[in-house]
Structures are given as structure tokens and as C-alpha cells.
């Protein structure tokens, strides 16, 4: 299988997000990389599902709480930017303060 660099990045994000999801389900608090992967993958999937940019931006703030992540992680993530594929093309989505 031959993948483009972008496809490899998406696959890596998905794999890291899957690991984060499993750890969260076991009651573990997510660290910085797990948190980024979890939110990024969810945003990409929401865009793929046909949500608007505004809906995806709002959705990004509802995924995790401070109780879901390790201490200090929310302060390390002032915003997340993701290039997501929407039905009408690829767009840059920015979520400010993803962990309220």
C-alpha cells in the first residue's frame, strides 16, 4: 500500500486517537499528545460526517473536560488547528480553548 504523507499523518492521528479513547475508557487521564490526537480525530470525523465549519468548531469544545486530562494539559492547548475534509473541500478549522 502506498500512502501520501498526508494519508500517513491521518493514519497516525487515528491510531493515537484510538489509543487515547481506550485509555480514557479505562478511566485514565489523557496526556498532551493523547489529548491532541483525540480532539483532532474527532474534528476530522465530524467534518467528514458533513457538519459545517462552525459546528465542528463548537463540537471541539465539548469533547473533553479538565477531569479527562492530566493537570496542566488544558493550559498547554490554547487552540487546535486541523485541516479537515468537508463535503465541499478541505478547510482549516481552529478551535480556541478546546478544554474549557
UniProtKB/Swiss-Prot annotation:
Q: What is its EC number?
A: 3.5.1.5
InterPro entries recorded: Urease_gamma, Urease_gamma/gamma-beta_su, Urease_gamma_sf, Urease_subunit
UniProt catalytic activity: urea + 2 H2O + H(+) = hydrogencarbonate + 2 NH4(+)
Q: Name one GO cellular component term.
A: cytoplasm
Work out whether the entry's keyword set contains GTP-binding. Answer: no
Q: Name one Pfam family in it.
A: Urease_gamma
Sorted alphabetically, which keywords does the UniProt record give? Cytoplasm, Hydrolase
Q: What pathway does the annotation place this protein in?
A: Nitrogen metabolism; urea degradation; CO(2) and NH(3) from urea (urease route): step 1/1
Q: Which SUPFAM superfamilies match?
A: Urease, gamma-subunit
Question: Domain of life, per the record?
Answer: Bacteria
Mainly resides where? cytoplasm
**What is a GO molecular function of this protein?**
nickel cation binding
Gene Ontology biological-process entries: urea catabolic process
Q: Where in the cell is it found?
A: Cytoplasm
CDD domains referenced in this protein's UniProt entry, alphabetically:
Urease_gamma (cd00390)
Say if the entry is tagged with keyword Hydrolase.
Answer: yes
**What quaternary arrangement does the UniProt entry report?**
Heterotrimer of UreA (gamma), UreB (beta) and UreC (alpha) subunits. Three heterotrimers associate to form the active enzyme.
Which family does the similarity line name? Answer: Belongs to the urease gamma subunit family.
Q: What is this protein called?
A: Urease subunit gamma
Organism encoding this protein? Burkholderia thailandensis (strain ATCC 700388 / DSM 13276 / CCUG 48851 / CIP 106301 / E264)
Q: Which gene carries the instructions for this protein? A: ureA
